[in-house]
Amino acid sequence: MKSCGVSLTTAAVAFGDEAKKMAAGKASREGEEEPLSLTVEEREALGDMDSRLFGFVRLHEDGARTKTLLGKAVRCYESLILKAEGKVESDFFCQLGHFNLLLEDYSKALSAYQRYYSLQADYWKNAAFLYGLGLVYFYYNAFHWAIKAFQDVLYVDPSFCRAKEIHLRLGLMFKVNTDYKSSLKHFQLALIDCNPCTLSSAEIQFHIAHLYETQRKYHSAKEAYEQLLQTENLPAQVKATVLQQLGWMHHNMDLVGDKATKESYAIPYLQKSLEADPNSGQSWYFLGRCYSSIGKVQDAFVSYRQSIDRSEASADTWCSIGVLYQQQNQPIDALQAYICAVQLDHGHAAAWMDLGTLYESCNQPQDAIKCYLNAARSKRCSNTSTLAARIKFLQNGSDNWNGGQSLSHHPVQQVYSLCLTPQKLQHLEQLRANRDNLNPAQKHQLEQLESQFVLMQQMRHKEVAQVRTTGIHNGAIADSSLPTNSVSNRQPHAALTRVSSVSQPGVRPACVEKLLSNGAFSAGCIPCGTSKILGSTDTILLGSNCIAGSESNGNVPYLQQNTHTLPHSHTDLNSSTEEPWRKQLSNSTQGLHKSQSSCLSGPNEEQPLFSTGSAQYHQATSTGIKKSNEHLTLPSNSVPQGDADSHLSSHTATSGGQQGIMFTKESKPSKNRSLVPETSRHTGDPSNGCADVKGLSNHVHQLIADAVSSPNHGDSPNLLIADNPQLSALLIGKANGNVGTGTCDKVNNIHPAVHTKTDHSVASSPSSAISTATPSPKSTEQRSINSVTSLNSPHSGLHTVNGEGLGNSQSSTKVDLPLVSHRSTSQIIPSMSVSICPSSTEVLKACRNPGKNGLSNSCILLDKCPPPRPPTSPYPPLPKDKLNPPTPSIYLENKRDAFFPPLHQFCTNPKNPVTVIRGLAGALKLDLGLFSTKTLVEANNEHIVEVRTQLLQPADENWDPTGTKKIWRCESNRSHTTIAKYAQYQASSFQESLRAGMQWCDLSSLQPPPPGFKRFSHLSLPNSWNYRHLPSCPTNFCIFVETGFHHVGQAHLELLTSGGLLASASQSAGITGVSHHAR
């Protein structure tokens, strides 16, 4: 394949000397310092570095010499591009993209790759470029383009050294897209490949087992997991994850008998998983769920506490704790736990529903309504109709609560609206600890925080007293073994706001600290009800409203009437309106990751419901190759601010919405990036005018959904990562005039992408920095001004160069810059060197020694044959009414009308593909009796007739004979008979229909033909067409031109219809085929 760079005669020239030549004669640059230069040794070392080293190069070894060298090379390239005003060799940008990719600066790598793509016409010959571009798209979850780039690599270079990595990523992406057959194929290809890979064979086998689980082939998944456990020298972390998956599968799936039997299998698996990895917060959470389902509330609480201590705060865990408290008649403690859950994830529908149920049980309908409204607003809530009915009931009957006395309580949002956030509480503690060393400004801030803290305390005590006096029927709050008020004396509840906040590690709301200090439950605990699986097709209802011993409301039929249990409130994920890939997205995020975190796991039944909005797409698979401390752990991404559907989402299949098993070992994308980043996790402080650009990869975790799933984006990979004015301002530090503040690192922001005329611009938020506007980069009339920018520029403005556009950049005189010489690889065969008529001996000789794994080491493609690709979809897309236009119908009254030239022109006009002509037989005075069965038998009874049998199917579908898959070719079984035999069949079948006492009806009762009907069978037979009309009544016929059948390989119809009439017309009448469909 073509190398990433080209060898120039000026390669030996130092970068410093070249820069001096370019700067000669430019007085404005006399005062500037000389740019960095690369030595010969450094250029030789860089010559071996391209995208193929991604995941294998260790940047922090040897004193981080490799990372320093790559950073120096990037700065040199950026400086020279600025001086050359962007008019450099296209391979220069390819090398720059490789270096930025190895440094894991994905935004800059994408910009450089896009520039190379737009400048190099035969970019498809460069396999290293396609591989690097695919890695960047994979990082940004642009699976549509990543799949295309990786497939192009395998097409142009089947023996590519990183083919195993490509198969691995293709398997993950196809699993996300629910193409399980393709996913399994690529996982198996990766498994049998002996080349080095960032993932071990055991980890690939884990992905295959999880793929079965995602397909709900639980027995196959169980066998695959158990077979993996028998592997010798299985890494401890892989073993822990497999055991975790097996335990959670037994808990949720009906693999064995009743509940007690399932838990008897699930709990030992989870305990063994914790033996292999005691720090797995996810396994502790699953164990708590299992204990809770069988009534071991004390053990469940201990497991939940262990989960919180070993991982970041999880909304799922706190919601489950709230259910336990609510089950124990401790509404205040349950309230605090639910508030922790909704604070960590404001869109946690199950927590809002449980909180609404709690308020409803305490006769606070207005607060319950507000909680139900919040649950209904959540994008992960599927039972909105049930919630709407409940809200309507509460609104209509709220005045009748408590004997007609309506209660006026502050809603939960108001109770804690004055509370400090966990971050401010931590800051307050720090200021108090350093009170003696504070400056005047800090002392003033401390006074303000303490005054606000006092107001919060007063508000909290007032609200708690109100709930105690009016909110509980029986007066007594709970078992004396647990305090009724779990709020710390020093710290109030964390505030509940519309903007969800993420609790930082080590910083917990006050209710969290107090709830953890409550200890175990009393011995007389009531077991909690078993929660439904999220994948269940049953309607999932709200919990009991009889928690405190109150009488259940008979007017609420869908509420459970069990006064002893309070099942978890779940949302049903099997919504018919939800796309399958969105349901399965979190399950395909399995990647075994090297870090000190807990295992991920979960059943594919519990999958988070992802937003269907145009600007959200969850990062399903980790794109970086991550390594930490040289051993495997399965991380628990416990910040549930993404798309966790319910309080169970963190344990969804294969880690649920909160985790992803990273499939890579060697590389580390970012210290701050979680394994499965949530869509709003890293949006940053809105008050900051300039974000850390080097951490941009941690911010871009959203995609416009159409950019991933829609096939209507053409074949251009030009993601507009840098052409958004707001995002560009963020990258170059111009936001709020903070360019020269030093808060941003230097970034070479190249803009090769193009804008379209439609409104597909990049989202203004840095978390949605990928656009769908990607026409062909060769359309120079649609290009925006390309610029090369530097964040460390002494000027506050943008360095806009090459303002004339890319079209002029290639035609202009280019500065001869010294490129790093890359070792050449196999090249595309020139078309002139290939003979089109080789002998068999030459062919056999060429096929000998095909190379490794049966694949040739040299490419057999011609230099003018790019990889195949489907044609671009028409733009703009046609509306539905245009896809199925109304069919014109014309009625003929006489022969003159039939031969009217405008009628012929109308019928042959491409704008009218189908035309129905009525009254043709009468206008032409055709004697259809001449074509009756009797007449044909008398004329030529031995004439061979072809009979075809076709399947009944909708007009817009075409299935194969087995009915298992859609095909393009119209299948039709062919057989032959004679007119005499067909007449005999027709007569006998007609007699059978008469004996069956068939009742004739009007033509309006026509029914579609059943499967296996014969094209020439009698229309009046119930076992064929089932067209019910008197056989003696002639019918009207639809006239179809011959081309209407030939485009699917069908001959026009030529034989009998009902009543002995032949559905064919005279060729002299200008009709080539007549349909026997009665009208």
UniProtKB/Swiss-Prot annotation:
InterPro entries: Corepressor-Demethylase, TPR-like_helical_dom_sf, TPR_rpt. GO terms for molecular function: chromatin DNA binding; histone H3K27me2/H3K27me3 demethylase activity; metal ion binding; RNA polymerase II cis-regulatory region sequence-specific DNA binding. The keyword Cell wall biogenesis/degradation does not apply. It holds the Pfam family TPR_8. It catalyses: N(6),N(6),N(6)-trimethyl-L-lysyl(27)-[histone H3] + 2 2-oxoglutarate + 2 O2 = N(6)-methyl-L-lysyl(27)-[histone H3] + 2 formaldehyde + 2 succinate + 2 CO2. PROSITE patterns: TPR, TPR_REGION. Residues 558-601, 609-626, 647-656, 782-795 have a biased composition (Polar residues). Coiled coil: none annotated. Residues 558-694, 757-813 are annotated as: Disordered. Its EC number is 1.14.11.68. GO terms for cellular component: MLL3/4 complex. TPR repeats lie at residues 90-123, 127-160, 164-198, 202-235, 240-280, 281-314, 316-348, 349-382. Residues 761-779 have a biased composition (Low complexity). Its cofactor is L-ascorbate; Fe(2+). It is found in: Nucleus. The modification Phosphothreonine is found at residue 887. One of its GO terms (biological process) is regulation of gene expression. Keywords: Chromatin regulator, Dioxygenase, Iron, Metal-binding, Nucleus, Oxidoreductase, Phosphoprotein, Repeat, TPR repeat. Belongs to the UTX family. Male-specific histone demethylase that catalyzes trimethylated 'Lys-27' (H3K27me3) demethylation in histone H3. Has relatively low lysine demethylase activity. Interacts with TLE1 and TLE2. This is Histone demethylase UTY. The gene is UTY.
